[in-house]
A protein has these predicted regions:
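The feature captures the beta-strand-to-loop junction immediately N-terminal to the Walker
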Residues: 33-35
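Helix-to-loop junction immediately C-terminal to a conserved catalytic motif
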Residues: 48
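Conserved ABC ATPase "signature" region
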Residues: 87, 97-114
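Helix N-cap at the start of a conserved alpha-helix in ABC-type nucleotide-binding domains
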Residues: 154-156
Length: 194
């Protein structure tokens, strides 16, 4: 599904990512690790099509509409409710039965009681859980998750553990995390950036 050959990214004279090469088959799970500033976020943005490589070749064999991206920004509308946000994204992605799918995800991630609350009133952890719902709403073939456990309490992190275990082998997943032990058992490949 993904082939990267000597992929680099520069911003002006700053090299944000240096000569990364890897392959990931459909259904695989790539765990990207490395210290702050090593290029993890840059690589995930490249995979999501939000940036283009300066050098090298990057091939992602997935339709853009079949990609789910969770970055550092939640990409949610603060003035809309949780349910309205998911219904909006459901329309954009043409999700059949979007209200039912949104309700199921809100229930799964412990947000059903807050479904009619404006996102601007949410805690950081609630916002992260809703962003995960948004990312999973259209059942993407490729999930690109940048620090998905960020701001999650233990209960929500355990929910995400279960979700990732359920997706293992059925979806292609690329994720970065400061807690690699959480997902090491699911990873079919590991990429350590320096």
């Amino acid at each position: 599904m993904i082939t990267a050959r000597e992929v680099e990214k520069r911003y002006g004279t700053t090299r944000a990512l240096r000569a990364v090469s890897f392959e990931l088959a459909t259904g695989g799970c790539l765990l990207v690790t490395g210290p702050n500033g090593s290029g993890k976020t840059t690589l995930l943005r490249l995979l999501a099509g939000l940036a283009t490589p300066t050098r090298g070749r990057l091939e992602v064999r997935a339709e853009r509409s079949r990609l789910g991206y969770l970055g550092h920004e939640p990409l949610l509308y603060r003035d809309l409710t949780a349910l309205e946000n998911l219904e909006l994204y459901g329309r954009l992605y043409r999700v059949p039965e979007r209200r039912e799918r949104a309700g199921m995800l809100l229930e799964r991630f412990g947000l059903w009681e807050a479904r009619n609350a404006r996102v601007g009133s949410f805690s950081r952890g609630m916002t992260q859980r809703l962003a995960l719902c948004r990312t999973l709403l259209h059942e993407p073939d490729l999930l690109v998750l940048d620090e998905p456990f960020s701001a999650l309490d233990d209960a929500a992190a355990s929910l995400l553990d279960g979700e990732l275990a359920t997706l293992a082998g059925r979806r292609t997943v690329v994720l970065s995390t400061h807690d690699p032990g959480r997902v090491l058992a699911l990873a079919t490949a590991r990429l350590a950036l320096a």
